[in-house]
UniProtKB/Swiss-Prot annotation:
<feature type="binding site">
    <location>
        <position position="83"/>
    </location>
    <ligand>
        <name>substrate</name>
    </ligand>
</feature>
<dbReference type="GO" id="GO:0004170">
    <property type="term" value="F:dUTP diphosphatase activity"/>
</dbReference>
<dbReference type="InterPro" id="IPR008181">
    <property type="entry name" value="dUTPase"/>
</dbReference>
<dbReference type="GO" id="GO:0006226">
    <property type="term" value="P:dUMP biosynthetic process"/>
</dbReference>
<feature type="binding site">
    <location>
        <begin position="87"/>
        <end position="89"/>
    </location>
    <ligand>
        <name>substrate</name>
    </ligand>
</feature>
<dbReference type="GO" id="GO:0000287">
    <property type="term" value="F:magnesium ion binding"/>
</dbReference>
<dbReference type="InterPro" id="IPR036157">
    <property type="entry name" value="dUTPase-like_sf"/>
</dbReference>
<feature type="binding site">
    <location>
        <position position="97"/>
    </location>
    <ligand>
        <name>substrate</name>
    </ligand>
</feature>
<comment type="function">
    <text>This enzyme is involved in nucleotide metabolism: it produces dUMP, the immediate precursor of thymidine nucleotides and it decreases the intracellular concentration of dUTP so that uracil cannot be incorporated into DNA.</text>
</comment>
<dbReference type="InterPro" id="IPR033704">
    <property type="entry name" value="dUTPase_trimeric"/>
</dbReference>
<keyword id="KW-0546">Nucleotide metabolism</keyword>
<dbReference type="GO" id="GO:0046081">
    <property type="term" value="P:dUTP catabolic process"/>
</dbReference>
<dbReference type="InterPro" id="IPR029054">
    <property type="entry name" value="dUTPase-like"/>
</dbReference>
<keyword id="KW-0378">Hydrolase</keyword>
<comment type="similarity">
    <text>Belongs to the dUTPase family.</text>
</comment>
<keyword id="KW-0479">Metal-binding</keyword>
<comment type="pathway">
    <text>Pyrimidine metabolism; dUMP biosynthesis; dUMP from dCTP (dUTP route): step 2/2.</text>
</comment>
Length: 151
């Protein structure tokens, strides 16, 4: 199994907040915590950047990381990522910040150390483009939206 070296920039990680960890052996994502000293209030419709205390340099062009929302925060409180999904390219070097958006109707308070998002490492395949006159015929053809029905 491939391992990625994630640097810890902030002593609060380990001292005050636990290291990111996979919750179960089957977990794909690591939880990212709000590395802040005091609670932050997020009004309805407001966005803010939350530091995670982590820095990353994947350094392997075959890998990237995606930052995803935590389902409970979005469903129960309307707290989602400001950019919906974050993408970290392999050649990025620097701190991880999470853009958080309160799309709910109520004020939401982000507590120090609260799990705000999750990070998943994914394989990368880059496309090569070829100009062609037509595609090879397939059984599906141009069947698009709803082509297979509802039942």
């Amino acid at each position: 199994m491939k391992k990625i070296d994630v640097k810890i920039l902030d002593r609060r990680i380990c001292d005050r907040f636990p290291l990111p960890a996979y919750a179960t052996t089957g977990s794909a994502g690591l939880d990212l915590r709000a590395c802040i000293d005091e609670p932050m209030v997020l009004a309805p419709g407001e966005t803010t950047l939350i530091p995670t205390g982590l820095a990353i340099h994947i350094a392997d062009a075959n890998l990237a990381a995606v930052i995803l929302p935590r389902s409970g925060l979005g469903h129960k409180h309307g707290i989602v990522l400001g950019n919906l999904v974050g993408l970290i390219d392999s050649d990025y070097q620097g701190p991880l910040m999470v853009s958080v958006w309160n799309r709910g109707q109520d004020i939401f308070t982000i507590e120090p150390g609260e799990r705000m998002a999750q990070m998943v490492f994914v394989p990368v395949v880059q496309a090569e483009f070829n100009l062609v006159e037509s595609f090879d015929t397939s059984e599906r053809g141009e069947g698009g939206f709803g082509h297979s029905g509802r039942q």
